[in-house]
Amino acid sequence: MMMEYGGYFSSSAVAQQSGDVPTTAPSAVTNSFFYTPQSHNIYHQYATPYLQSGRALTTAHNTSSSSAGNSTSSSSSSSNYRNTTHDSLQAFFNTGLQYQLYQKSQLIGSDTIQRTSSNVLNGLPRSSLVGALCSTGGAPLNPAERRKQRRIRTTFTSGQLKELERSFCETHYPDIYTREEIAMRIDLTEARVQVWFQNRRAKYRKQEKIRRVKDEEEDPLKKEPGQISLEEIIDQI
């Protein structure tokens, strides 16, 4: 019994001196009491899976590191490509495209403005002061062309003229409501009816003046001195 305890303590001392290294060779404890071929087989049984798992972890770590390096390099290269492409596009947009668009828009705008201004000035009547000063040149219009440019006269039918004459006998100065009513009855615009009444009043004044002259020639004593007739008052208005 004493020899067994002595072998145990001697093996413990050897294990402490080796620094508790897990990979101690079996030869370091060959003289130990507990070293047997069975314990050596058990050591290899447990050590081999751990070593294999360690190698597998190391290989996986190296593979992941290499893949991470490849992905980092690919991402950096793609980012560099994107940055280069973005810089190229930005330089293109900042130099060529804006210049071309500005030049084209400037040319189109100036041509359009010039054509529009010339058309507006050419559309002005030459008889007016603005048309005479701003005309772009060319020979003045002859009377035939001026007649063509005049407004087309309205041709009244017999029924329209009868209705207008009847309304004129009722009043020489119809208001806008009366003119609109007349225009609706004879299928004309209110502006045409107003122009007709203006022309009819002018014609009526001329007829009344001619009639007065004839009356004075036939009977000069009929009119007393200083007397003003109603027709003269209307003519003065």
Swiss-Prot record:
Xref: InterPro entries? Distal-less_N, HD, Homeobox_CS, Homeodomain-like_sf, Paired_Homeobox_TFs
Disruption outcome = ALA and SIA axons exhibit outgrowth abnormalities, failing to run along the lateral cord to the tail. ALA axons are shortened further in a vab-8 mutant background. Drastically reduced expression of let-23/EGFR and plc-3/PLCgamma in ALA neurons. RNAi-mediated knockdown causes severe defects in the ALA neuron in young adults.
Q: Which GO terms describe its molecular function?
A: DNA-binding transcription activator activity, RNA polymerase II-specific; DNA-binding transcription factor activity; DNA-binding transcription factor activity, RNA polymerase II-specific; RNA polymerase II transcription regulatory region sequence-specific DNA binding
Q: Which Pfam families match?
A: DLL_N, Homeodomain
SMART domains (UniProt xref)? HOX
Gene Ontology biological process terms in this record: axon guidance; neuron development; positive regulation of transcription by RNA polymerase II; regulation of axon extension; regulation of transcription by RNA polymerase II
Region (Disordered) residue spans: 58-82
Bias-annotated ranges (Low complexity): 62-82
Q: State the similarity comment.
A: Belongs to the paired homeobox family.
- Function description: Probable transcription factor involved in postembryonic differentiation of the ALA neuron, and regulation of genes that contribute to behavioral quiescence, a sleep-like behavior mediated by ALA. Regulates its own expression and also that of homeodomain ceh-14, together forming an autoregulatory loop in the ALA neuron. Involved in fasciculation-independent longitudinal axonal navigation in many neurons.
PANTHER family this protein is in?
FI01017P-RELATED, HOMEOBOX PROTEIN ARISTALESS
The protein's name: Homeobox protein ceh-17
| Native organism | Caenorhabditis elegans
Per the UniProt record, the lineage of the source organism begins with:
Eukaryota, Metazoa, Ecdysozoa, Nematoda, Chromadorea
Give the gene that encodes this protein: ceh-17
